[in-house]
Amino acid sequence: MKSRKLARKVTSKYHELNAKLKTSLTKEEKVAIKDEIKALGGIDKYQQASVISTQFFNTSKFIIKTLRQFINNNSVRTKTNVPNVLEVGAINTVLKKYTSFKVRAIDIHSQHTLIEELDFFDLPPERDYDAVVCSMVVNCVAEPERRGEMICRLVEQIHEGGIIFLVLPSRCIQSEYLGMDLFDSFLRGLGCIELQPKRITPHLIFYFLGKSSTTASSSSSSSASHGSSTVSSWPDSICATIHSLMDTQTLERLTPPQAESTASTTSASANYTKKFRLYLPKAFVEYRTHET
């Protein structure tokens, strides 16, 4: 696949079919839609199309230019004279050509000798990178729950004063159950701050995220107390943080109608934790098609 027009057609159709699967359908109708997704090429073809859709925008050049601006105005503080950058899901070696940066490029299925073949989920929370680049990768993770987890792990890779360049399809965020405000609240709950306003295009959303000092210190404390169990403890700590940031009206939006019945004796905090674990991460795959 080399055509940008065809790539957008594939991604749009994939989104549309997945949205239909979320509606009330008969068993036969769901089987038919799954067969159509398979005929389209499934998640593999969608991933290829997502990459092609963004190749025409020089993401690497834009990121390097923006990172230099952040460093020059002290919005990003580097630990050394040569900024330490992690590129997650690298599809080329363009970033590595900038010798003024030390770039570690990884991908689960490396297509180049200079790109390290590594599953990002196997990477320990190093908290030592000046910058992490994750462009059109979260939306390609197959399991819905892991998409939410991936963003949590991205935050754990930068030190206080670092930056995350996160690029997602607009339709991942502007969906029926998620929305920009709710996703922004989710990021704040992870301790993220926007170093500059997000850049929104018709198809993509660019986030420029830093880590607050409170999050950095609490992460270090958690590591010292729990050691290797830190990663598995993220969901509970994230739930507690976000719960303190969101009002009741926002919390109600987290649960789809069919999942609202809970025991009256369940505490609000525990109930929210359950909602977050089971639902919010899945919001990243709610590719809803809004008909006019």
Regions of interest found by a model, annotated:
Residues 95-127, 133, 142-145:
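Adenosine-cofactor binding site in Rossmann-like domains, unifying the SAM/SAH pocket
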